[in-house]
Amino acid sequence: MDLLRQYNFKIADASPEYLERRKKQAVLFMTAAAVTIFTSRFAYKSTITRQYIPTLFQGNHSPPLGYNFTSDAAVAVGTGTMLCASVSSMICFGTCWVLDVSTFREFGWKMKSLMGGTQKEQELADMPMDEDSAYIQDGLNDILDGKVELNFDDE
């Protein structure tokens, strides 16, 4: 930490909870990256082992007799799904790490602030309300506050 303070890094003054949170986000991203590397290596190995290399005088236009298209398709779908899931998780965890997001609610707040939602909300709140909307809002507030008693039994 003294080295970080020496070079004037702001993270040197961060709370231990913040440092632990950032460490957790980094570990999630690194784990997803490791899973992506292992999955891509598995996909490469499974592709190489299924590769058909004909002998010198065999035709290379038809697969061997013991070839099973169903199992090959199942392996391809499984491998593609694993690759897609691992890369997607790596992108998701990396984005959350960069944006310092740990929950879906924080993600919503961060996106709202990045897209100017708080400014638009403030502008909308500052606009004057028309008479009909104010009447409806006051009526609903009276009902919620218990100032109006609704009697549905009388006809």
From Swiss-Prot:
Q: Which GO terms describe its cellular component?
A: membrane; mitochondrion
Where can this protein be found?
Membrane
- What keywords does the record list, in alphabetical order? Membrane, Transmembrane, Transmembrane helix
| Chief place of localization | membrane
Cysteines joined through disulfide linkages? none
User: What InterPro entries does the record point to?
Assistant: AIM11 (IPR038814)
Q: Which positions, given as ranges, span the membrane?
A: 27-44, 77-99
Q: How does it sit in the membrane?
A: Multi-pass membrane protein
The family classification in the record reads: Belongs to the AIM11 family.
This one is known as Altered inheritance of mitochondria protein 11
